[in-house]
Curated annotation (Swiss-Prot):
Similarity annotation: Belongs to the actin family.
Ribosomal protein as UniProt keyword: no
Protein name (Swiss-Prot/TrEMBL): Actin, cytoplasmic 1
Major enzyme class: hydrolase
Organism encoding this protein: Chlorocebus pygerythrus
EC number(s) per entry: 3.6.4.-
A GO molecular function held by the record: hydrolase activity
Residues carrying Methionine (R)-sulfoxide: M29, M32
Catalytic activity: ATP + H2O = ADP + phosphate + H(+)
Subunit structure, as described in the record: Polymerization of globular actin (G-actin) leads to a structural filament (F-actin) in the form of a two-stranded helix. Each actin can bind to 4 others. Identified in a IGF2BP1-dependent mRNP granule complex containing untranslated mRNAs. Component of the BAF complex, which includes at least actin (ACTB), ARID1A, ARID1B/BAF250, SMARCA2, SMARCA4/BRG1, ACTL6A/BAF53, ACTL6B/BAF53B, SMARCE1/BAF57 SMARCC1/BAF155, SMARCC2/BAF170, SMARCB1/SNF5/INI1, and one or more of SMARCD1/BAF60A, SMARCD2/BAF60B, or SMARCD3/BAF60C. In muscle cells, the BAF complex also contains DPF3.
One Pfam match: Actin
Amino acid sequence: MCKAGFAGDDAPRAVFPSIVGRPRHQGVMVGMGQKDSYVGDEAQSKRGILTLKYPIEHGIVYNWDDMEKIWHHTFYNELRVAPEEHPVLLTEAPLNPKANLEKMTQIMFETFNTPAMYVAIQAVLSLYASGRTTGIVMDSGDGVTHTVPIYEGYALPHAILRLDLAGRDLTDYLMKILTERYGYSFTTTAEREIVRDIKEKLCYVALDFEQEMATAASSSSLEKSYELPDGQVITIGNERFRCPEALFQPSFLGMESCGIHETTFNSIMKCDVDIRKDLYANTVLSGGTTMYPGIADRMQKEITALAPSTMKIKIIAPPERKYSVWIGGSILASLSTFQQMWISKQEYDESGPSIVHRKCF
C-alpha cells in the first residue's frame, strides 16, 4: 500500500495499493478511452481484465518505470499537487541496497523536480508516532519485516534485523492452503487480491497454536464463511490462524529463519546490556501485518518465555499502527528542527544522488 498526504495531518489523504495494471486483452471498442496502464484503486477495480504488477518486492523497488507511475499518480491524481512546489519525505526499509536509495533520490529531483527531499527509516517513524524516543519497533508490512532498536532517538544499525517474510507471503500461503484443502483455485493476480481480503477480514493469531488446532478439529466454532465476488460462499476453518502462524513459525513457508518473536529477541540481545530493559518495556508493533487480532498477546507470551524471568515486558500495539509510519512522517516533516535536515535541490546538483547516504542516515 502507498500512503500519501500532507505534513501536519493526522492521517494520510490517499491510501492505495502499490500496483500497476496493464490490459491483458486487445481493446475492441473505439472511443472507450482505454489506457495502457492503471494505478492503485483503478487497477484494483479493473483487475479482472488486467495483469497486475507489483513494482516493490520485499521492500525493494525492482521496476522503476512502474514506481514512477505510482509516484506520478500520487502527486497528480491523489494529492493534486505540483511536486516542484513541495518538499517530499519518502520512507525506506532499513538494510535496503544503497542503489535503491540513490535512484529514489534521483527520480525525485530529476523527474519530479522537487525543491527538497528526505528519506526516513520506516520503523523510526513508527516510534515517533507512538510518542517515544526509546524502544524496539517490529515493523511488518507487505514485503518485509524488520526489528529496529532505537535508543534516545538513535537507531542502532548493528542490531537491526530483517526478515523477508511479510503480508504478501502470508497471502500466498493462504492461497496455497485454501487450494490444498478445498480445491478452490486462486491463481491469477486478481484472485490473489481476493485472498488478501479474506486474510485481512478473517485471520487471527492463536495464543496457543496446538490447542487452537485441537479446538478447530473437534468443533465448527472457529469456522467463518466468505462470499466470493461471483456469489459462491466458501468456509474457512483452521486456515484462519494457520496463515498468520507462519510469522511465528516460518518453517510453514519452508523458510529457515526465526519467527518474529525470536527476531525481536535477537535484535534486543544485539544491543548493549544496559539498554535492553528499556527495549523490552517498549516493544512497539507497526505495519499492516501486525493488525491480526491476538498478535500482541502472542508476542507478549513468546518474548516472556525467551527473556530473563524478572524482566518487565510490554508490547505496544497502537490501534492506528497500520498507518503509524505515515503518521510519524507527518510529525517529523512538520517539526521546525527538521527543516534543516532536508536535502535541497542545490545540494543534489552539487553532490549527485550519493548525498542521500550522508544526509539521511
